[in-house]
Regions:
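Alpha-helical transmembrane segments and their immediate juxtamembrane cytosolic regions
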Residues: 2-141, 216, 229, 289-577
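Ankyrin-repeat boundary/"N-cap" motif
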Residues: 139-149, 163, 172-183, 206-213, ...
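Ankyrin-repeat-protein effector appendages
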Residues: 140-149, 232, 251-293
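Ankyrin repeat A-helix N-terminal signature
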Residues: 149-155, 183-189, 216-222, 249-257
Length: 577
């Protein structure tokens, strides 16, 4: 029977062997975020500074990395948090978390986040004065016209001809999973919207993120299209995976409209969008059955929704989630101690047994997300569906520490896990973007929607366990270089995003291949931040705050050991998990 950490409130003096491999793996997950954010400029995903050229390979890299990176990080964080909790006890654990996570988060809020906003505002001003070349791709189209491109362009004769020829009016396009009704609504092509509705298009059909065509019409201020959709029975109370109704979608500002328009390859005049939204709002207010939609104005609900949907923490949101999960772990430990919980059988933490519970549980929480991988929640109140998803990984990481002998064997079959992860990830990613990709096998869109989160769960767990096993093979021995990179990863991740976005704005004017720009940006930013860490962080108060004290080379002092890096008897490591 394995024991839950810190069943006693007092610290345990027993040392814990250093886990070089898991600490390096946690740093790897954090540093991957630099490449992920750099690659977003070239992926078909809304982003702050989007390049004129896209790269399918970089887009796949971004999505696959996003699919496992933070789950892996939270898995490692749960392990090291349980280790720290055992050593320090509940009170010491919470004090340490406040110092190593809460305080850096607060400092980042008054330094890094304002710098980020300055880069965004400055970049948009420069781009507004001298816009870079636009992306050259748009509505998904083959050489021959299709129902989606015809609806988007408002080409009514072509829409009519295609529908009469059997084109599907209720199927999303295979590229961005958008319905013909929504494509027609983006440009407020009312005649096309009316014809599609007459031809059987469902105004309440869901798309990616569980949006409906009415969400799209309201977002883009397509007043005529919105009126037609409402007349056809579109549900004003329909909520997408972000909890937004069509009315909520009208609250997004210019930046969001520009992002989505660029993603879809269309143009949007924000003044016209705002005017259309005002007209839609007047139309909704005039509806006699407004009270039946279930979307009555609620200042309290709107305020809470705003706190959930906000971008307060930007890329530092994961630290805020760690604060919540650390408190939950301390509370669970106190409760289990009161209940005299003896622990879980080691068998339940071993493979493949643990996967029989982890994969279904993760598939459920993944089904609450809006695409491939987990969603982001950067508001003051974490979105429950996002926090719950990461809690699965954090919680199992804590259980891994309680059953260290079993946990040590988790990734031994990494040579099996990683190929399974590659196959499951490829299939899940394909189904995310093309629900009918395997239609020839009899897999319809409804079945694909149920299968996709299961495949994603298989992907993320086999990838995580496989990387754990590979790290144990390659990184178990101590290494000064690996230790330095591991220590620096916290600083690099906190500070990287303003530099990345500034570089993306600058590179938008160059005519380099996407891979060359990506490599240049990632390499320069990483190099500069490593130099800054060595010169200005590692041996200063910033380094002591993030990582604990580190002696200068030749000082003749040995660094105190740290949880997750060394024996836990005298922890000083900036435990970000």
């Amino acid at each position: 029977m394995t024991h839950f950490p810190s069943q006693n409130s007092t610290p345990s003096p027993a040392p814990t062997a250093r886990r070089h491999d898991l600490d390096a793996l946690r740093a790897f997950a954090m540093l991957l975020g630099i490449g992920l954010h750099a690659g977003l400029a070239y992926a078909p995903i809304p982003w702050i500074a989007m390049n004129r050229e896209t790269s399918p390979a970089l887009g796949a890299f971004v999505e696959i990395t996003h699919g496992f990176r933070l789950p892996l990080f939270f898995l490692m964080s749960g392990f090291f948090s349980a280790m720290l909790l055992q050593r320090r006890g509940i009170r010491g654990f919470l004090r340490h978390r406040a110092k190593r996570i809460g305080l850096p988060l607060l400092l980042g809020m008054v330094t890094v986040i304002p710098a980020m906003w300055a880069v965004i505002i400055g970049g948009n001003i420069v781009v507004g004065v001298t816009p870079p070349p636009q992306r050259e791709w748009s509505v998904p189209a083959d050489d021959a016209p299709n129902i989606w491109s015809a609806a988007a362009s408002g080409d009514l004769p072509t829409v009519q001809r295609l529908v009469q020829s059997g084109a599907p009016v209720n199927e999303p396009d295979p590229r961005v999973y958008t319905l013909p009704l929504a494509w027609a609504s983006i440009g407020d092509n009312a005649e096309a919207v009316a014809f599609l509705l007459e031809s059987g298009a469902d105004p309440n059909r869901r798309m990616g993120d569980d949006n409906t065509p009415l969400h799209t019409a309201c977002f883009f201020g397509a007043a005529d299209s919105a009126a037609l959709l409402l007349d056809a029975g579109a549900d004003l109370g329909a909520r997408n995976k972000g909890g937004e109704t069509p009315i909520d979608s009208m609250r997004h500002g210019r930046g969001a409209v520009d992002f989505i328009a660029n993603l879809l390859g269309v143009t949007a005049d924000y003044e016209k969008v705002e005017a259309g939204r005002r007209e839609i709002a007047r139309l909704i207010e005039s509806l006699p059955a407004r009270s039946e939609t279930g979307d009555q104005p609620s200042p309290v609900r709107d305020a809470i929704a705003g706190l959930v949907r906000g971008e307060l923490f930007m890329h530092l949101w994961f630290l805020w989630h760690l604060c919540w999960l650390a408190c939950a772990l301390a509370l669970a430990t106190a409760l289990l101690r009161t209940l005299r919980f003896r622990g879980v059988p080691p068998l339940l933490i071993s493979t493949p047994v643990c996967l029989f519970a982890l994969i279904p549980l993760t598939a459920i929480t993944q089904s609450w997300q809006s695409g491939f991988g987990p969603d982001t929640s950067a508001g003051l109140i974490p979105a429950p569906r996002v926090l719950a998803h990461y809690a699965v990984f954090f919680g199992f990481g804590a259980l891994m520490f309680t059953g260290r002998d079993a946990a040590d064997r988790l990734g031994r079959a990494w040579w099996v896990h990683l190929p399974i992860a590659a196959l499951a990830g490829a299939c899940a990613l394909r189904l995310t973007h093309e629900p009918l990709a395997f239609a020839e096998t009899g897999l319809n869109a409804s079945t694909a929607a149920r299968l996709e989160p299961i495949l994603q769960a298989v992907f993320v767990w086999t990838a995580s366990l496989g990387l754990m096993g590979l790290a144990r093979v390659l990184l178990s021995a101590p290494s000064e270089r690996v230790r330095f990179v591991s220590d620096s990863s916290y600083w690099l991740y906190i500070a990287h995003l303003p530099l990345i976005v500034a570089g993306q704005f600058a590179l938008a004017y160059l005519d380099l291949p996407p891979f060359a720009e990506f490599a240049l940006l990632t390499g320069v930013v990483t190099g500069l931040l490593l130099l800054s860490y060595r010169a200005f962080v590692r041996y200063t108060w910033i380094g002591r705050l993030l990582n604990g004290p580190r002696p200068r080379p030749g000082a003749g002092l040995q660094p105190r050991e740290a949880p997750g890096l060394a024996r836990v008897s005298t922890p000083t490591r900036a435990e970000t998990g």
